[in-house]
């Protein structure tokens, strides 16, 4: 993968629950200007499960066009890791082909949820999607949401047998699993998919992060990753410790409920709107978010 720090973008909605394209573009530009290497549209945090196929594709297009038209501080272009996950292989395949056609740099594909395929089913699912495109593919293991895990032998087999499967987003919560993957395949790039473990995964062989907190604090997430890549353990740990209470607050309810409310409180999105079955956070969660953002001087 040609990037290391990335944010799993929220999808802002208007009051009528249509996608707020202007705010979405502004959020991506903010990521670019604050030093992130890549953005990840329409993943879990982007509420992809409740977007229509047309909306999903359009969000990918917006991300790609915004990144093409906005230079980073180093005068380069931020990469787009397009989410193409679905519990139907045919739909993921269609989204993958579309993402490649419109210029995505790579695709992120989650394991099918609800279906609970066998390991052979997971292998065939990912292989079929990856072989339909030429751009790099990042597997996404998040068993708490999908009900099934990509077991280490399956992940390694995919990496070894499918040339454009290059990376895996690890949200299993298991550092033992991260260590095992890195032990057997040093070139299989591991990305943290769990903000509270960013530092631990980076110093267990990780190559980057796909961060939820990065929506709010892209500069600090980028700094932490860059320090880790330079083997500056203590500096990276200081940033991780600084962000830890924010990481915790953003996951007190189902993601992306807290992060969208936090971004609203911070003035980054106008409407903290959600599509059912997701609903607004509790009053207790809002108070916690307000207190946490005050501690970080994000709000007064």
From Swiss-Prot:
Subunit structure, interactors included: Homotetramer; dimer of dimers.
Could you tell me which Pfam families the record lists for this protein?
DHDPS
Q: Where is this site: Part of a proton relay during catalysis?
A: 44, 114
- The portions of this protein that span the membrane are none
* Catalytic-site annotation from UniProt: 140 (proton donor/acceptor), 169 (schiff-base intermediate with substrate)
Q: Which PANTHER family match?
A: 4-HYDROXY-2-OXOGLUTARATE ALDOLASE, MITOCHONDRIAL, DIHYDRODIPICOLINATE SYNTHASE
Task: Name the chemical reaction catalysed here.
Answer: L-aspartate 4-semialdehyde + pyruvate = (2S,4S)-4-hydroxy-2,3,4,5-tetrahydrodipicolinate + H2O + H(+)
Under the heading SUPFAM superfamilies, the entry gives: Aldolase
CDD domains on file:
DHDPS
Q: Would you tell me the protein name for this molecule?
A: 4-hydroxy-tetrahydrodipicolinate synthase
Keywords assigned by UniProt, alphabetized: Amino-acid biosynthesis, Cytoplasm, Diaminopimelate biosynthesis, Lyase, Lysine biosynthesis, Schiff base
Stored NCBIfam families: dapA (TIGR00674)
* Biological processes annotated in GO: diaminopimelate biosynthetic process; lysine biosynthetic process via diaminopimelate
Q: Does the keyword Magnesium apply?
A: no
**Which lineage ranks, top first, belong to the organism behind this chain?**
Bacteria, Pseudomonadati, Campylobacterota, Epsilonproteobacteria, Campylobacterales
Q: Which GO cellular component does the record give, naming just one?
A: cytosol
Main function: Catalyzes the condensation of (S)-aspartate-beta-semialdehyde [(S)-ASA] and pyruvate to 4-hydroxy-tetrahydrodipicolinate (HTPA).
**What pathway annotation does it carry?**
Amino-acid biosynthesis; L-lysine biosynthesis via DAP pathway; (S)-tetrahydrodipicolinate from L-aspartate: step 3/4
UniProt GO MF annotations? 4-hydroxy-tetrahydrodipicolinate synthase activity
Q: Which family does it belong to?
A: Belongs to the DapA family.
Q: Which organism is it from?
A: Helicobacter acinonychis (strain Sheeba)
């Amino acid at each position: 993968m040609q990037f290391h720090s990335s944010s799993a973008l929220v999808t802002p909605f208007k009051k009528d629950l249509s996608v707020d394209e202007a705010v979405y573009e502004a959020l991506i530009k903010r990521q670019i200007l604050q030093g992130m290497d890549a953005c990840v549209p329409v993943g879990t945090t982007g509420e992809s499960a409740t977007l229509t196929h047309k909306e999903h594709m359009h969000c990918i297009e917006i991300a790609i066009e915004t990144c093409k038209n906005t230079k980073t501080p180093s005068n380069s272009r931020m990469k787009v890791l397009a989410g193409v996950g679905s519990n139907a292989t045919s739909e993921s395949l269609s989204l993958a082909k579309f993402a490649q056609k419109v210029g995505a740099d790579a695709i992120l594909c989650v394991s099918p949820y609800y279906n609970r395929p066998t390991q052979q089913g997971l292998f065939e699912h990912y292989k079929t999607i990856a072989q339909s495109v030429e751009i790099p593919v990042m597997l996404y293991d998040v068993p708490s949401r999908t009900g099934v895990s990509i077991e280490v032998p399956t992940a390694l087999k995919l990496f070894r047998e499918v040339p454009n499967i290059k990376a895996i987003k690890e949200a299993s919560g298991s550092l033992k699993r991260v260590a095992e993957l890195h032990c057997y395949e040093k070139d299989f790039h591991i990305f943290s998919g769990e903000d509270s473990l960013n530092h631990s995964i980076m110093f267990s062989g990780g190559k980057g992060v796909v961060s939820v907190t990065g929506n709010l604090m892209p500069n600090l997430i980028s700094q932490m990753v860059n320090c880790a890549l330079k083997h500056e353990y203590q500096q990276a740990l200081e940033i991780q410790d600084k962000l830890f209470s924010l990481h915790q607050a953003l996951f007190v309810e189902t993601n992306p409920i807290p992060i969208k409310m936090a971004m609203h409180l911070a003035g980054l999105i106008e409407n903290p709107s959600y599509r059912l079955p997701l609903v607004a956070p509790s009053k207790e969660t809002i108070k916690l978010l307000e207190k946490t953002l005050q501690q970080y001087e994000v709000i007064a």
